């Protein structure tokens, strides 16, 4: 059993690096969705979808490049825990990508955020917006990354506004 068997999501606001862009990442089997925030951490927007390479770390290199290009102060990777709050294969995969990315971008912190049902929510949003199923595949990972990051930003703002909570703000 590894540490990742019991990996729980991080809490927004703890060890907060202060003002600056954040990057949200949705790790999938085939693609990785990427989103970013404005420097004030108010709004998440899609950036790109990175093709996943199981046989190489090309996707991790691209993610690290985006962190540098966007001058991110924090990275938030979705942790897809099961509905029973367990760590399944998808969560182990996300943790592996997060750890590989953290090694490349240190000292920029990489956090894990609870992302149960974000892909389902993203699919529903795209369907309601009239995007056909074929078109959804190209966008779904970015929309899920936006959902992960926006949730983190909202929770961070609330944590930093609470008395005695958070970091620099």
Curated annotation (Swiss-Prot):
Q: Where is the composition biased (Basic and acidic residues)?
A: 1-19
Q: Enumerate the HAMAP family for this protein.
A: Nuclease_YqgF
Instruction: Give the EC number(s) listed in the UniProt record.
Output: 3.1.-.-
Example of a GO cellular component annotation carried by this entry: cytosol
- Subcellular location field: Cytoplasm
Q: What is this protein called?
A: Putative pre-16S rRNA nuclease
The enzyme class is: hydrolase
Record's SUPFAM superfamilies? Ribonuclease H-like
Location of the region described as Disordered in the Swiss-Prot/TrEMBL record: 1-22
Higher taxonomy: Bacteria, Bacillati, Actinomycetota, Actinomycetes, Mycobacteriales
Q: Which SMART domains match?
A: YqgFc (SM00732)
Family matches, as NCBIfam families? RNAse_H_YqgF
Q: Which InterPro entries match?
A: RNaseH-like_sf, YqgF, YqgF/RNaseH-like_dom, YqgF/RNaseH-like_dom_sf
Which GO terms label this protein's molecular function in UniProt? nuclease activity
Which GO biological process categories is it annotated with?
Answer: rRNA 5'-end processing
Alphabetically sorted, this entry's keywords are: Cytoplasm, Hydrolase, Nuclease, Ribosome biogenesis
